[in-house]
Amino acid sequence: MKIIPLKAAHGDALIIQFSSRNKDYTIVVDGGPPETAEYVANLYDKLGYIDLLILTHYDNDHIAGILEFFSQHKHDTSEYVGQVWVNGAQLIYYDDEVNTAAYEDAFNLTVCLKHLKDHGFICQWRDGITCDMNPIIKDDFRIDILSPSTEILRTLEKSLNIMWMNMVCRMIQMLMKRYRLLMP
């Protein structure tokens, strides 16, 4: 297992690569802040096929590199990303009254996701991934979702408040053979 924390200034961006019995996997978590977005997006570009891209939450220091990566591929039609996990994306809408950077980034990400899914660049976009689900077991590894709960997502749905948007933050535990990785 190879875990590559990217130099993303004060933000988060992580690449996890490993081999199971049946295939090699690449998982990407978050994309770092605007000042490293191009650097992170270019690294993601060199990975080849990405099996799973996880966005933990919508803060700018987690989302900018992913926005840049998706923007670079807005016209691509070949599948490059197997699954994208983003909670609450269907709840984001653009509102001139609430024109904060976080809302704008989240709205732009949602537009990108819809476009890339429609054009085949992303195979599957999963929303509503919660700790209430069974572990995800594939080949010889397992992913446990530790948060958020369904209750937190329902509260987000009702409030549409920027503070609640960040409570969709996903905590994941990944288990593989003798490795255990806890990711925010």
PLM regions with names:
Residues 21-24, 50-58, 105-117:
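A generic short-segment signal for beta-strand/edge and adjacent turn/coil regions
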